[in-house]
Amino acid sequence: MSNIAIECSNVSIRYVTGDFKSIGLKEYVIRKLTGNYKVKEFWADQNVNFELEKGEMLGIIGSNGAGKSTLLKAVTGIMLPTEGEIHVNGTIAALLELGSGFDNDMTVRENTYLRGALLGYTRKFLDEKYDEIIRFAELEEFQDYCFKQLSSGMKSRLAFSIACLVHPDILILDEVLSVGDGAFRKKSGDKMQEIIQGGVTAILVSHVMPQVRELCTKILWLDHG
């Protein structure tokens, strides 16, 4: 059995703006008829290569707009690369955007089960993990609050707790560890150390270099793709 968890080979990702997919069919037809139709394209990532073995942690760094989040979306299967191939061996829990996978009008309790279900876990498993998730997120007093009533730090804590405590094969975090107060950042960093020692493969996008150096076994630097 292969020990490779993620293999990214010559991956390039192109965005196209101005076509009917991005502006809508009606606007596309109007622009075509009036001669005001231009298609622009840019490459968010170009010829990206990396290989990550099980139990390793990759840190992805780079300035804003360098293509970090786009690459993560391709690794998780949210979007397909324009060129190249990505092979993933294992289940993925991903925190790509704050609040993604949650319903603003549902309670913290309901959202915990919803998010867990989206990650593929059973009600029985989530029943067993629920109290631990809420304790780690420090949201014991907010279980019946609507998600939209939480602060950004609370939302991040809940998302991180669910992803880390359901034991995925691969954990992908986009700037999540930088949200929240200092005490929770330390606690989440300690949890990441525990996760890696337990054999989980992880990818972390972060602007905090000391955090990347401390946690990651490999680093990928992206510079405008």
Segment roles from a protein language model:
Residues 2-44:
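Pre-NBD coupling/linker segments of ABC/ABC-like ATPases
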Residues 26-33, 113, 125-142, 161:
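Conserved ABC ATPase "signature" region
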Residues 61-63:
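The feature captures the beta-strand-to-loop junction immediately N-terminal to the Walker
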Residues 206-207:
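H-loop/switch region of ABC-family ATPase nucleotide-binding domains
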Residues 212-214:
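A short, surface-exposed alpha-helical micro-motif characterized by mixed small hydrophobic
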Residues 224-225:
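Conserved ABC ATPase "signature" C-loop
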